[in-house]
Swiss-Prot record:
Region (Transcriptional activation domain): 230-293
Gene: mybl1
Name used for this protein in its record: Myb-related protein A
Region (Negative regulatory domain): 296-534
Single GO cellular component term: nucleus
Length: 728
């Protein structure tokens, strides 16, 4: 048998190597690379091109329309190279592979293949896993293994890797070869294993289906009769389903793990996978059968149960049967074929394992104790356990109509109440989380009126009670009441409050005065009334804050008046688009030190004098330039000097002696009446508002100027020493 399997594997490997035309597709920018298999003509063409050009795969790929360089290289090295050895493995090669695997491990196949001439990594890997691995069984196939392969293949199909997990020591390749070469023909043509599995089926099923309820209760401690309108929990109406499920679980009676097995943990994991696959098979068979699940409370198992034991108990609970009680009309319903494997049969093979034996000691198999339903705890809260369609439901929804029935526990008259759902509940139905009602907590943020008036269940997020805020003063007043403008908060942005999320169908019953966001709304008043002083715009605030952060607090620096004059000249020149000022040529050596302050003030006043172009508009008669220069004095600043145009004052010079100054003062006295007689007339063309304000041409400014001039005319200085300076 082993020799036959070996020859079949070698033949299959060789066939796969010769005719495996599936190559991984390499993406390229231009060539539409083909996914098709390599043809015989393409293989011959590759051989000729390699003989001619060598292993220059760029040149070789140019002769193919839809093949890339990588594809040509892969095809040559893996299939077409004459250096490849495709024959059977020799003893020397096998020994070399074993040594290299012990050295590099069972995953470095590319490195291992470099030490074996003519072999590639794929060949070395398959040789090790299929033949040279000491864990691989080379003995003949047993009938029990055939039964496992048959039942697993019927459930999972050609998933050989999953089936190999159920058979320790057998590889997926060997199982596939055994099925294709031997078992498939026997099962389909000769009826292999079908007679063996069906021989004991009629007597067992007939005895269990025709047994009385008391007999079922004595045999199965988890048997619970329910009402007739509720379908049974684990009833199968078709004999074929019973046969398939029984066949899938018949191998559980055989222990797969020995107590002295060095790979005991691995076997235990494989057994767990076996039970999980059986559970999936049962679920797949139950769903199309149309049977519904009975809602009931389950008992709490101890926390000391391991994960493996929980899987086993799920299997045990899934296959415990529930029968029906005859209906009220007295007609006996047709009993279906049911499947109820014994708990001892399932758990007996596990008693030989120390890990399972310690766990099984925690379970009392006494039927008297297990049949006492009053001893079980039936919680009304949801269990955090993972729910599967075949497990007893751990949760009772408040929306379910619960039915209670009295059950005889062990025939001694003790009754227990078992909760079951309404027959209108669909199969395996579990209400969504969003539809489950929750308990009403007294600490929710409800007003006393709402809490006392109705018992509405909140479906939104509870909101914390907010602290007192001065903004809540707006709640007390009516909408039409006058607001106190002195105590208003200086905020222009409304504060976003937390909204209570509620369903659209829920009516909002909170009084208007208690609304949470009522105090955070900006009142509709004029913003100009909220503050007297102007406020700095936000961009300037940000800029000032950045400057203070970088350079420290800002400080006011007094600038010389000459810089102010230059700024005013620049602004006026930009607005009027004319150069209205004529620079004076100053002779600093002619000015005494005591005149420095007076000259500075004169420069400031000089910038406020009208342009020379406005002389015609005013209609005034001005003096000659030489008369102005004679009447100008550096120590005196008469009022009439303000009305002298700028062009006539540019020839001012410093006097060298006091006598000359006195003479100029007398001339200035003669000039004053002439200047005082100047009448201001209305301008031909009205000035703009800005120019009128800047140049003092408004009506109020003209009146005040005339009154000031008349007032100053009454002042008669007695001497030059008694002159007083008037600084505007």
């Amino acid at each position: 048998m082993a020799g036959r399997a070996r020859s079949e594997d070698e033949e299959e490997d060789g066939q796969f190597t010769e005719h495996d035309y599936d190559v991984s597709l390499q993406k390229g920018p231009k060539k539409p690379w083909s996914k098709l298999r390599w043809t015989k003509d393409e293989d011959d063409k590759v051989k000729k091109l390699v003989e001619k050009h060598g292993e220059d795969w760029g040149v070789v790929a140019r002769h193919f329309i839809n093949r890339s360089e990588v594809q040509c290289q892969h095809r040559w090295h893996k299939v077409l190279s004459p250096e490849l050895v495709k024959g059977p493995w020799t003893k020397e090669e096998d020994q070399r592979v074993i040594e290299l695997v012990h050295k590099y491990g069972p995953k470095k196949w590319s490195i291992i293949a470099k030490h074996l001439k003519g072999r590639i990594g794929k060949q070395c890997r398959e040789r090790w896993h299929n033949h040279l691995n000491p864990d691989v069984k080379k003995s003949s196939w047993t009938e029990e293994e055939d039964r496992i392969i048959y039942s697993a293949h019927k459930r999972m199909g050609n998933r050989w890797a999953e089936i190999a997990k159920l058979l320790p020591g057998r590889t997926d390749n060997s199982i596939k070869n055994h099925w294709n070469s031997t078992m498939k023909r026997k099962v389909e043509q000769e009826g292999y294993l079908q007679d063996l599995m069906n021989c004991d089926r009629p007597s067992k099923l007939q005895a269990k289906s025709c047994a009385a309820p008391n007999h079922l209760q004595a045999q199965n401690q988890f048997y619970i009769p329910v009402q007739t309108q509720i379908p049974r929990y684990s009833s199968l109406s078709h004999d074929d389903n019973c046969i398939e499920i029984q066949n899938s679980f018949s191998f559980i009676q055989q222990p797969f793990v020995d107590a002295d097995d060095p790979e005991k943990e691995k076997r235990i994991k494989e057994l767990e996978l076996l039970l999980m696959s059986a559970e999936n098979e049962v679920r797949r068979k139950r769903v199309p059968s149309g049977s519904s699940l009975t809602w009931s409370e389950s008992y709490h198992m101890g926390e000391s149960m391991s994960n493996t034991m929980s899987h086993l108990e799920e299997q045990t609970h899934d296959f415990y049967s529930l029968d029906e009680i005859p209906n009220t009309s007295g007609q006996q319903s047709v009993e279906d074929k049911i499947l109820a494997p014994e708990a001892n049969i399932v758990l007996q093979p596990l008693e030989t394992i120390p890990e399972f034996s310690e766990t099984l000691e925690l379970i009392d198999v006494d039927t008297v104790d297990w049949n006492n339903i009053e001893s079980f705890e039936l919680p009304f809260t949801a269990s955090p356990a993972k729910h599967t369609p075949m497990k007893w439901i751990h949760e009772i929804s408040p929306e379910c109509a619960l039915n209670s029935c009295l059950v005889q526990a062990d025939g001694r008259g003790s009754a227990s109440r078992v909760l079951s759902s309404s027959p209108a509940m669909p199969k395996f139905y579990s209400p969504p989380t969003i539809l489950r009602k929750k308990k009403i907590h007294p600490d929710l943020s409800l007003t006393p009126e709402v809490r006392d008036a109705s018992n509405v269940v909140l479906k939104g997020t509870p909101v914390k009670t907010r602290q007192y805020s001065p903004l809540q003063l707006f709640r007390s007043g009516n909408v039409q009441n006058h607001l106190n403008l002195d105590n208003l908060p200086l905020t222009s942005t409304p504060v976003c409050g937390q909204k209570i999320s509620a369903t659209p169908l829920q009516r909002q019953i909170t009084p208007k005065k208690d609304k949470e966001n009522a105090g955070f709304r900006t009142p509709t008043i004029r913003r100009s009334l909220m503050a007297v002083t102007p406020r700095t715009p936000t961009p300037f605030k940000n800029a000032l804050a950045a400057q203070e952060k970088k350079y420290g607090p800002l400080r006011t620096v007094m600038q010389p008046l000459i810089f102010v004059e230059e700024d005013i000249m620049e602004v006026l020149k930009k607005e009027t688009e004319k150069d209205v000022f004529i620079k004076e040529e100053k002779e600093s050596d002619c000015k005494p030190m005591k005149q420095e302050h007076v000259s500075t003030v004169r420069k400031v006043r000089k910038s406020l004098i009208l342009d020379s172009c406005d002389k015609e508009e005013l209609g005034a008669d001005f003096l000659a330039p030489d008369e102005v220069s004679q009447s100008q004095n550096g120590n005196t600043l008469p009022t009439s000097f303000l009305m002298i145009p700028l062009g006539e004052r540019q020839d001012q010079k410093c006097d060298e002696n006091t006598d000359t100054r006195k003479g100029s003062v007398m001339q200035r006295k003669n000039y004053i009446p002439a200047t005082r007689n100047v009448k201001l007339q209305s301008s031909v063309q009205p000035l703009c508002e800005w120019e009128a304000v800047v140049y003092g041409k408004t009506e109020d400014q003209l009146i005040m100027t005339e009154q000031a001039r008349r007032y100053l005319d009454t002042y008669k200085p007695t001497s030059s020493s008694g002159l007083r300076h008037l600084i505007l």
